[in-house]
Amino acid sequence: MSLLHIAVILPLIFALIIPILYRFFKKIHLGWFVLPIPVVLFIYFLSLISTTQSGNTVIKTLNWMPHIGMNFDLYLDGLSILFSLLITGIGSLVVLYSIGYLSKSEQLGNFYCYLLLFMGAMLGVVLSDNLIILYLFWELTSFSSFLLISFWREKKASIYGAQKSLIITVFGGLSLLGGFILISLAGDSLSLHELIANASEIQHSPLFIFAMVLIMLGAFTKSAQVPFYIWLPDAMEAPTPVSAYLHSATMVKAGLYLVARVTPLFAISQGWIWTITLVGLITLFWASLNATKQQDLKGILAFSTVSQLGMIMSMLGIGAVSYHFEGSQSQLYIAGFTAAVFHLVNHATFKGALFMITGAVDHVTGTRDVKKLGGLLTIMPISFTITVITALSMAGIPPFNGFLSKEKFLEAMIEISHANVFSLDTLGIVFPILAIVGSIFTFVYSIKFIMYIFFGKHQPNALPKKAHEASILMLLSPIILAVLVVVFGLFPGLLTQSIVEPATTAISGMSNVNAEFHLFHGITPAFISTLIIWILGILLLLTFSYWIRLLHAQPTRLTLNHWYDSTGKYLPNYSANMTNSYVNGYVRDSLVIIFGMLIVVTIVTLLSVPFDFNFKDINNIHIYEIAILILLIIAAFMVVIAKSRLFSVIMLGVVGYSVSVLFVFFKAPDLALTQFVVESISTALFLLCFYHLPNLNRYNETRSFKLTNALISIGVGLVVIILGLIAYGNRHFTSIGEYYKAHVYDLAHGKNMVNVILVDFRGMDTLFESSVLGIAGLGVYTMIKLRRKHQSSEVKSDEQAEQ
């Protein structure tokens, strides 16, 4: 096992150990025991930067189930190390922050167990090379995030948010699994880097488009893109450390990682480029618009997170256009990848800090309601400084890092509207328009976030707690992030060569990537767009009280949340009614549905798939065989029309004995003897049972009832006959009987082939069948014994009552 494997497994192991430590060290905050884990992992991944910076990749294999191609393979390149550093780096700061945020009276054992479980799952997602292993870790992130969001399970809103996130992300996970299976079938491999290497062949597969759609669904649900974004605002009911971790740097970025990782596979598709870019931009616009009307600080950050995720998603779509050009023109669109990678880091820094400050404000004032907050500038000066730096970075104001990636984003959007491919040079004009409008509202909610907390009139009577500055433990992590916002804004070169360029190379497949970010590079269309954003943003701020009423006037019934809640309300009743319509307690009705579907599926298959009948190897039919068949048919018909149960059982026995005679004709004496014995026993049991059964009324059967029975019976008979003839006439493989003939003696040392097959070749099958019969027999015996005890107890009670 390599160090890379240990890095993934380590948080999962400690997730099991930490709750045990909590029992013995309750006087010490459990976070101090957890903190070294992400710190050590962060240092380890930092040591690997030199490897990925030089263009090398690391592949580590650990055999698990190699016979089905399912191994614990890890793949480290510039993209995966970027996400690994975010997961462990932000994770370290979140754990440090949680020590000040969560008191010792909380269920810290559970909290840190869930947090480490999530951290290990995220590392597994970004480092796994095997598609099935990646999917398992993907679902583990959904499960662990459900536990984290519902941590305060006494609150109904927490349970509701956790359930919603689980339902939507698991739906995406199932779609993702389907996409992975299809793409692995198309590429004949479960290895992600092998599939990317064979992208040119996979793109011609008929499964390509279906795999692409399913994988996009998985990515969109995880990264909260329109229309699946509705789970993220409700997930804000989680403790603030969870929100700062999951919704700034980790879980919501998993979908972005997936899109970036599989871009080399799907970038050739016009549908991929248009869908990824357009969905991202619509998400940016819609979420930024909704963020402006939120009355809860976390609500603002939730929708701002959705909008920023849409922004990064659209950048990845723009970058995919580079696969259709070469040379300098390709470099123009690779700027989309570099902007996406750089903004991934920038968003983690400023959004993580903003979540932590929001938690600090909530912690010291007791509320996040913007109507009750305000005037905290002099009371919380350190928090104010951090908020100004990070919120202005989110708004795209220099000299902070958010401005640099926003400029590159606008530059890429303007360039794409001139691309002479997939009609982007005509229809692509919608891209920069959506980008600019979304950025205007981003500017508005970023400035309003500062004003809501620190400006206006202080209302001490409206606050549940007396406001004061947060503790140093709660401020240390956001201070570090705010410093990084400034440093990366002034010195972007610290990231470009070590992080941005290797990650961009991993996505684009080009080795000569040159990522450059400058605070000012002349009067360009992107800079002019920025000026427009600032001017219109200021105008909207000045007229905020007028136009915000229009947003609040939106009918609730037109929202996606209303549709989600309505579906959750009515779906169980609808499903129950549908189920009750065919699962009504009548065996006959269930059989009609089952056999009816069998007939329909068989007919559709026969009409769509060519087949033929081949009778060349069929032996001659003798007169005595025809006689037995006629007897069998007559007996079966008499079973159906019999008026007496006794006569029906006798005719059923005739059917069974006729089959045993046919086995004798076909030279299968063992089968004939078995059939004869079974038929004799079953007939005797039937007669014994019927002797004890009460007389039942015979219901009048309608004509439609009889007609349905007749059609189903005839249909099933024809299906079995046709399938049997087709199977006989279309033998594409050597009969397995030849294998048994060749090895029945030398492997099993037996001469009776049937017995050897049952006892040796299919011995386990026979054993389990016998076990099932034994269990059924025990069940019947238990029921009879309990009935006898019940009857005897009733007799005793009656005797005592008489006495």
Swiss-Prot record:
The keyword Nucleotidyltransferase does not apply. Pfam families: MbhD, MbhE, Proton_antipo_M, Proton_antipo_N. It is a multi-pass membrane protein. GO terms for cellular component: plasma membrane. Belongs to the CPA3 antiporters (TC 2.A.63) subunit A family. NCBIfam families: 2a6301s01, PRK12645.1. This is Na(+)/H(+) antiporter subunit A1. It comes from Staphylococcus haemolyticus (strain JCSC1435).
